[in-house]
UniProtKB/Swiss-Prot annotation:
Protein name, UniProt field: Corticoliberin
Region (Disordered): 91-122
GO terms, biological process: negative regulation of epinephrine secretion; negative regulation of glucagon secretion; positive regulation of cortisol secretion
This protein's UniProt keywords: Amidation, Cleavage on pair of basic residues, Hormone, Secreted, Signal
């Protein structure tokens, strides 16, 4: 009888714990967005944390949390990576030289022949491979989230059992 009471109490406590978004609202409003990142960094998988950092930089972390929609967070993560790649692409020396010379595109005749050869050697990534890798990353994130939830449940049961 005691065991059933403890188990039901534990289940009620776990079900009544505030979600990650609510915990962020509970914290003091005086804390800056930079102070929010360390608290989030330990509670969620790496890719979701990167998505939240991206949202935090945009200033709309709580409008759409990637933790509630993993597929949406993956899409946002991919968009963020594409933006980062575009920034890196535009900051490459060959690209800067081409833009300074007044070239309209990076594929102009003023481009270095070694860069063209390098680009020709690299095989294009298949779209199927890209989605396969994205699916695997999402599965790994879900597995990590389940493992974290199991760990927190074990800790809660240890606390209740003492």
């Amino acid at each position: 009888m005691k065991f059933q009471l403890w188990v039901s109490t534990g289940i009620l406590l776990v079900s009544l714990l505030p979600c990650h978004e609510c915990r962020a609202f509970i914290k003091s409003p005086a804390s800056s967005p930079g102070a929010l990142l360390p608290a989030l960094s330990n509670s969620q998988p790496f890719l979701l944390r990167m998505g939240e950092e991206y949202f935090l930089r945009l200033g709309n972390l709580h409008k759409h949390s990637p933790g509630s929609f993993p597929e949406a967070s993956a899409g946002n993560f991919v968009r963020a990576v594409q933006q980062l790649q575009a920034q890196q692409w535009s900051s490459q020396p060959g690209m800067r030289a081409a833009s300074l010379d007044g070239a309209d595109s990076p594929y102009s005749a003023q481009e270095d022949p070694t860069e063209k050869a390098k680009r020709a050697e690299e095989p294009p990534i298949s779209l199927d491979l890209t989605f396969h890798l994205l699916r695997e990353v999402l599965e790994m994130a879900r597995a990590e989230q389940i493992a974290q939830q199991a760990h927190s449940n074990r800790k809660l049961m240890d606390i209740i059992g003492k």
